[in-house]
Amino acid sequence: MIKKSAAILAGGKSSRMNYINKAFLKYEENYFIERIIKALEDYEEIIIISNNPEEYTEFGLKVFKDIYPSQGPLSGIHSALNYIKNDYCLVVACDMPFINKEVVNYLGNIKEDYEILIPKFQERLQPLCAIYKKSCKDIMEKELINNSNKLIKTCFKFSMKVVEEFPFIEKIHKKEIKNFYNINTVHEYEDLIRKKEI
């Protein structure tokens, strides 16, 4: 058991997905959110951040609303850090159907000498599959109050440890290397399903 919390961010408007709740898109017979919950099962606590908590009752998890709604993923992370019981929280977006258990467990077991532990994959930082220290919430709140809600910009206000190497990555099946791949548009989702059926 990893003595950290995990939070699934499911509060976005999904405007590029015709306002469909991306958490309930299906891949291989399971909702995205079901696949993510399964990958996070070794974390001591799992919560969901959503402004529609009634949609998630079937999963038996605590669901909390954004403290500062309609301010993007920074608001979701800030809310999660206010509600978790542990000092560190892995944050995952609900539109990442390939979240891999081995990857998130590897992150969760890295020594806690950071405020933010953030993977870098294919030359890009991945703030929506990263671990945040609970104490980050205070500076995040100041940013939200000032309407400065840019996530990456805010991350640079903290001591970050960047993870660029995953020693086991070559052992992971090709489709699971997409751990950080997210679905933003109807076209991307249709393309995902089409490739699965080929």
Curated annotation (Swiss-Prot):
<comment type="similarity">
    <text>Belongs to the MobA family.</text>
</comment>
<keyword id="KW-0501">Molybdenum cofactor biosynthesis</keyword>
<keyword id="KW-0547">Nucleotide-binding</keyword>
<keyword id="KW-0808">Transferase</keyword>
<keyword id="KW-0963">Cytoplasm</keyword>
<dbReference type="GO" id="GO:0061603">
    <property type="term" value="F:molybdenum cofactor guanylyltransferase activity"/>
</dbReference>
<dbReference type="InterPro" id="IPR029044">
    <property type="entry name" value="Nucleotide-diphossugar_trans"/>
</dbReference>
<keyword id="KW-0460">Magnesium</keyword>
<feature type="binding site">
    <location>
        <begin position="9"/>
        <end position="11"/>
    </location>
    <ligand>
        <name>GTP</name>
    </ligand>
</feature>
<dbReference type="GO" id="GO:0005737">
    <property type="term" value="C:cytoplasm"/>
</dbReference>
<dbReference type="Pfam" id="PF12804">
    <property type="entry name" value="NTP_transf_3"/>
</dbReference>
<feature type="binding site">
    <location>
        <position position="95"/>
    </location>
    <ligand>
        <name>Mg(2+)</name>
    </ligand>
</feature>
<feature type="binding site">
    <location>
        <position position="66"/>
    </location>
    <ligand>
        <name>GTP</name>
    </ligand>
</feature>
<feature type="binding site">
    <location>
        <position position="22"/>
    </location>
    <ligand>
        <name>GTP</name>
    </ligand>
</feature>
<dbReference type="GO" id="GO:0006777">
    <property type="term" value="P:Mo-molybdopterin cofactor biosynthetic process"/>
</dbReference>
<protein>
    <recommendedName>
        <fullName>Probable molybdenum cofactor guanylyltransferase</fullName>
        <ecNumber>2.7.7.77</ecNumber>
    </recommendedName>
</protein>
<dbReference type="GO" id="GO:0046872">
    <property type="term" value="F:metal ion binding"/>
</dbReference>
<feature type="binding site">
    <location>
        <position position="95"/>
    </location>
    <ligand>
        <name>GTP</name>
    </ligand>
</feature>
<dbReference type="InterPro" id="IPR013482">
    <property type="entry name" value="Molybde_CF_guanTrfase"/>
</dbReference>
<comment type="function">
    <text>Transfers a GMP moiety from GTP to Mo-molybdopterin (Mo-MPT) cofactor (Moco or molybdenum cofactor) to form Mo-molybdopterin guanine dinucleotide (Mo-MGD) cofactor.</text>
</comment>
<dbReference type="GO" id="GO:0005525">
    <property type="term" value="F:GTP binding"/>
</dbReference>
<keyword id="KW-0479">Metal-binding</keyword>
<dbReference type="InterPro" id="IPR025877">
    <property type="entry name" value="MobA-like_NTP_Trfase"/>
</dbReference>
<keyword id="KW-0342">GTP-binding</keyword>
